[in-house]
């Protein structure tokens, strides 16, 4: 920690000595209005934060440079190249200072999968960041990033993206859309695959106080050296038709998804204590397929300047099949299979009332209904039916007396109902979210948030089917699980020290009750072995997180440096009482030279403790390097991941009364990626704000094994 503090102090002292002249932005890039015309209003009510950033009507605006647009091929990569204080790129997503993923909007319309696949950074005129926006087009989101792009009447845009990692996975996407007057039509096709034959693990497992074949075992140890392999293929398509006027939006999507695991598994070399199994190896194999057509409708109506209505619905059907094989030596194999059909329906209704610029009111209601019918074969021969309904309702009130201060309050309720066979359960709990924002000066921004979060048990977690996964292990869900609840508190701030240096700070506290954790207990005398099941612990878990981000831009904004130390503390009082501290560090350096950008990055090691203190994990840090070329239409990026480690290392340790394990994993480490994107437009004008949803992940109630 002392080294991090010293390094931070050094950065603060040395940066002023190497700062260079201000960046020059072309006149054509300045202050575009939403319709892409130049602003004619005066700067009254506009708070300038930096040379290309300003706050107006509670919205933070930023203009990307020409170089930043060219060296990007997605919303997240554009945010990364812009090096903003209040938004960051993380694992291909955009996150705010609290670490929350921020949804992407384009010209005030939510960007779905096809929007992202046809996103053209070259056309971005302005980036806006809004928190708790009153505009009902933002669907009641707590924070959004909105990209202002030109809207045209007639034309189209086509984008092709090829991503390949060596070794050994890739995805390939082609998307296009056509605009004619008020109508927009879109089409997307995407394929992906993955092959991993490089994962291995070594370690030891202890089973305690169990029966097996009429004999009681106090302790049994298995030492293993396992080599695993995994494979996956997938295809997704989406079609869209949308009609838009100033007061109405009507959009319908049809999508289709197919995924398969053609065969994955592992082969291990084992040593058993007491020579329980006359075998030196074990084999596991499994396959899976999922097929899911989906249809989605979105509607927006503006009745007046004060009354609005947004609603949507989505229906999805899925067929999921799985098979599993487990064998120790020449023992009788353990076989399992499932054939599942799923029907899902979700409805969202959000009326809004905006009486003035200072006040807004939103009623947000959702209803989700899922029906599962699953046929189990193998260790469990039965057909199970499960029905679930989740209903939420909240009333959001916002008060913004001026651009520098705002308050929101959102009380609500969440109810869950489910029926599994003849067993019924339900829960109803209150929810609450509150936030406050304050900008004491043009360089300082403060925000705080308090929320009561609820998550019901998933269909697979509440599944009461008992499955035998291996010779000594069974799995069992729990239909009596309580809803996970947590109090989340965050305070964060951003500070623009100078035009070339900015700081951001974050502090969070989360208290979790009824966490859903994994435990083990002895199986019955007839079954033998152990049963892995899910329970709610008696005690809570407390987490405290703090982070600092230092961002600097030098040499006419061509050199960018980012430094981010993080600290976390976990206090668990569940099955195992424990306290845990962890400090890590990440950073990056990027240099732009006309249409080329070169960069190096470092992501520090990671430690965590969860499962009520029973599970501890560690992962090593990694260095990366990249070089990117872009000219507006063509984007080409080469990256080297984990450049100093041929294999990525991590370990996992689990400790409980009846089952304990410790494994060291060696996974895919050093890898090289190529990302090629080509985008072109045609016709007079192009509208890139189409809302098309690709197929989301298919739901399943199937109980997960080991």
Question: Residues of each region from the PLM?
Answer:
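Bacterial Sec-dependent N-terminal signal peptides
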Residues: 1-24, 43, 248-250, 307, ...
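Short, acidic, small-residue-rich periplasmic hinge/interaction motif at the N-terminus
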Residues: 23-68, 89-92, 131, 136, ...
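Short, charged/polar, Gly/Pro-enriched secondary-structure boundary elements
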Residues: 43, 54-56, 102-105, 151-157
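N-terminal periplasmic accessory domains that precede
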Residues: 45-49, 72-78, 93-95, 114, ...
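Short acidic/polar hinge/loop motifs at secondary-structure boundaries
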Residues: 75, 83, 108-134, 176
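Extracytoplasmic beta-strand/coil segments of soluble accessory domains associated
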Residues: 76-109
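Primarily recognizes Gram-negative and organellar outer-membrane beta-barrels
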Residues: 131-133, 139-142, 149-172, 180-497, ...
